[in-house]
């Protein structure tokens, strides 16, 4: 085992600072510990110009947005984590797969059904922090995305490894749009008396068309 993990709630709403899409052990220039590199990955289904965001985050004053949990129709984790979403006539399945003995997570999206042209947008929200800390907006973070084959790589701070984000679909497009997202609230940290608000940085988003029956791996 390489020691990396993915941890969140069943509806993909992080409630603790230990939650993240990709958490892995690091050492070397950094103190030896687990680090959250990818905090969240927000998916958006687009049809006829209408956007349906599958993500879910909690902010202050009990505000949840964008309420993507309402599209969840099935969840199964008996062998691997599988979530099925239904948005109108669209049925999208998401599966989490780990590469054995490597700190590599693959997320497979399969368009099970759709009655019209469908586009999928993936927006990574980056943390690059110790699992015991919280990320705050700052001017030192490098919000640029650097091209690599089939995707981009990001590294917010020196001393961290590069985070390679790639897609199996050759014609997928990455749109650079660096920006901070503010005040994600982790309610279980607040209940324990700890700081529970975090800012996450996005370097941009991936966008690609997906056909019925097609699978694309992130």
List the model feature ranges, each with a label.
Residues 1-218:
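Terminal accessory carbohydrate-recognition/targeting modules of carbohydrate-active enzymes
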């Amino acid at each position: 085992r390489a020691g990396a993990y993915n941890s969140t709630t069943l509806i993909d709403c992080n409630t603790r600072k230990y939650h993240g899409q990709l958490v892995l052990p690091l050492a070397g220039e950094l103190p030896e510990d687990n680090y959250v590199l990818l905090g969240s990955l927000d998916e958006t289904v687009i049809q006829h110009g209408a956007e349906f965001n599958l993500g879910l985050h909690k902010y202050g004053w009990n505000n949840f947005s964008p309420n993507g949990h309402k599209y969840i129709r099935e969840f199964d984790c008996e062998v691997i984590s599988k979530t099925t979403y239904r948005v109108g006539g669209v049925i999208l399945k998401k599966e989490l797969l780990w590469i054995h003995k490597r700190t590599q997570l693959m997320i497979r999206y399969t368009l099970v059904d759709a009655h019209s042209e469908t586009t999928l947008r993936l927006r990574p929200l980056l943390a690059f922090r110790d699992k015991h800390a919280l990320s705050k907006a700052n001017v030192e973070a490098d919000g640029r995305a650097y091209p690599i084959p089939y995707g981009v790589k990001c590294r917010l701070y020196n001393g961290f490894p590069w985070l390679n984000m790639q897609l199996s679909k050759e014609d997928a497009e990455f749109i650079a749009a660096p920006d901070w997202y503010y005040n994600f609230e982790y309610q279980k940290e607040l209940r324990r008396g700890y700081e529970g608000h975090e800012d996450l940085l996005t370097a941009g988003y991936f966008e690609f068309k997906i056909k019925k029956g097609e699978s694309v791996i992130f």
